[in-house]
Structures are given as structure tokens and as C-alpha cells.
Curated annotation (Swiss-Prot):
The protein's enzyme class: translocase
Example GO BP: glycerol-3-phosphate transmembrane transport
Segments crossing the lipid bilayer: none
Gene name of the record: ugpC
Protein known as: sn-glycerol-3-phosphate import ATP-binding protein UgpC
Residues binding ATP, per UniProt: 35-42
Family: Belongs to the ABC transporter superfamily. sn-glycerol-3-phosphate importer (TC 3.A.1.1.3) family.
Organism from which the protein derives: Vibrio cholerae serotype O1 (strain ATCC 39315 / El Tor Inaba N16961)
Lineage summary: Bacteria, Pseudomonadati, Pseudomonadota, Gammaproteobacteria, Vibrionales
Substrates-to-products reaction catalysed: sn-glycerol 3-phosphate(out) + ATP + H2O = sn-glycerol 3-phosphate(in) + ADP + phosphate + H(+)
Predominant place of localization: membrane
Amino acid sequence: MLDIKQLVKTYDNGHQAVKGVDLSIHQGEFIVLVGPSGCGKSSILRSIAGLESITSGEIHLAGRRVDNEKPANRDIAMVFQNYALYPHMSVYDNLAYGLKNRGVDKQTIAAKIAKVAKTLKIEEYLDRKPAKLSGGQRQRVAMGRAIVRDPQLFLFDEPLSNLDAALRAHMRLEIKKLQRELGVTSVYVTHDQVEAMTLADRIVVVKQGEIEQVGTPAEVYHQPASTFVASFIGSPAMNFLPASIKQGQLHIAGKHCYLPQFDAMSSENITLGIRPEHASLHPLTNAIELKLDIQVVEPLGPNQLVHGKIIGLESEQDFIAVTAEIPLDVHQTLPIWVALEQLHLFDQQGKRFVQSHRSCTQSSKVASTRQQ
């Protein structure tokens, strides 16, 4: 439906914001571009919209090349962070403005606006000016203006950034329901990984102008392609610990387990990734046990964040575990177990070691520790 081929965007100051991006988006898909500020995600979006000229590459929409066409001719509608509503116009006139410019007759405009207003539940606001609306109401009007055009493609440029946390959560749900109902292909830009995980059919993680990983929310969460993706997707961020592997034996904090899939691999410097929510306080089978020296406990209500250091590591690497809300003391030693299937291994360049299945047996030293 939308095909981006070797997209490059270099600005006049020489900064290359987008570096040869290739991306294919299917009809009706909801794609979220996510990454830190300055990673190039907004440049990709603005290039699709035609708000930025591209340096090289091609953009095809429904089989038609559009990168050499004016924005108005691309059949794309965009929703901005700042709503981009005309303050002197009523909500109705804001919704009708684009249709009037295209020469659509008044009766058709009225019918389209009535349908969109009902869908977005903004019927009672049609006579109001934007200044009389809340942030969430303005964002719904901005979405309505895009929907009423009946475009082939929706583009969302961080549309929820100006809203408070509660309203963001509500609007996320509204956008997802609306996109499912309309079935319009959508590309959404955000720096918020929660928005990415909850909204996307597929997530595109962008780093320094290049695509780091494309996958479903589950794929990006459970099989991050790199330490960058692993640290960006998931909250709290993944823990990273120094480890080594020798002929399949994984060594970490004085303990080791055998990974038969890696029996031909040896490296003195690898990174072991553990998600905070995968640290169990109860012994698990086919798991590795580590001990945490507690530094800080942050109560969150139903659970808590336990910050500390892994005992046995030479480095002073911080470690966070998400646990049930139980009484814990600073400098208490807390045993934690992590299922081997939930360990993530990365090489010295931060790239993921890929394997289809893990089956580890622990050494007697680890086993004896677990029995204490």
C-alpha cells in the first residue's frame, strides 16, 4: 500500500536525518514509528506527507509514485501535535474547510461532517470555536478534519503530546478504535513507547536515521534486535549485565549455566539482558538465580520497583526488579530467579544472539545456591 524505497533526507546544513530507509506498509495497517528525539522519525513522516523534499529514494502510495507530487495531490491527511485548527472558525467550518477548497457541494459536506461528528462524538461542539474546547476535544476535531477528507493514508505526528496522562490514555483508545472502524492505513510518530505498544500493528524502531527493527509489539518486546531496542521498548527499561560465554557455558556473577545452542561460541564480553518484570522472587525450574543487594525500593501500589546491585559482579551495574508489594529493607539480600527462556544475549556491538530454543542445565554451584 505504502512503499518507501531507499529514502534519504539530508538538510542544507549537511545533517543526514534519514539514511536509506526501506519500509513496506500493508493496506489497513497501523504502523508506529518510535524513537528518541532527533532519530529521524518525524523527517520520514514529513517526507511521506510532502512537507519535506527528499534527497533521494522513492515513495509509492497504492502503486503510484508520490514523492514528486505536491502534498495536496497525494491523498494523505495529517494530524498534528498542535491540532492546526483555525481559531477564528467554528468546529464545523474547520471540518468543512478542506472540502470547500476542493469544490465539494454543501449538501455532501454537511452529510460527511454529520457522520464524522457522530463517530467522534463532537456533534454538540460544531458551533463552537477551538478556544472553547478542551485539549482532547480539539484533538478529536483535528482527527475529524482528517477523516472527513476520506484519504488513502492517515499520518499522525505525535498527536497526544500536549495532553495530560489520563487524557492521553483515553485518546489512545479512541484512536485505536477509530482506526479499526475506518480501516485506513495509518502511520503514527511518537517517542512514547507505551503509545507504540498499545496502538501499533507493527512498530518501526528508528535510531539515528535508520530502522533498527520492524515487528509486532510482541516481537519487539520479546525479541529485541539490539540493546537499543531492548532499552527503548519496555518500562522500566531492560537491565543489562556483563557476562561471558565459553563453549555454551554462560557465566554471570560467579554462576553459570549451559546453553547448548551456543556450544560453538566463546566470548569474554557479552551483555545479558533481563527485563525487570521477569525477575521472580520464587524458585523456578530451568532458571538462573542471582542475588540482589537492595539499594532503593519504590512503592507503586500493586507492585514496587526494587533497585540494587547484583552480588558477585565486579561492575556497579544497577539492576531493577518489579516485585509484589512486600516489606523489604535497604541492603537486604534478595534472591531472584530468571527463567532461562527470558534471558536475552547480545554481542559486543549490542546485536542480539538469535536462537530458536534454550535449554540450560545449571552447575552444582548454582544448584546448591538455589537450595539455601
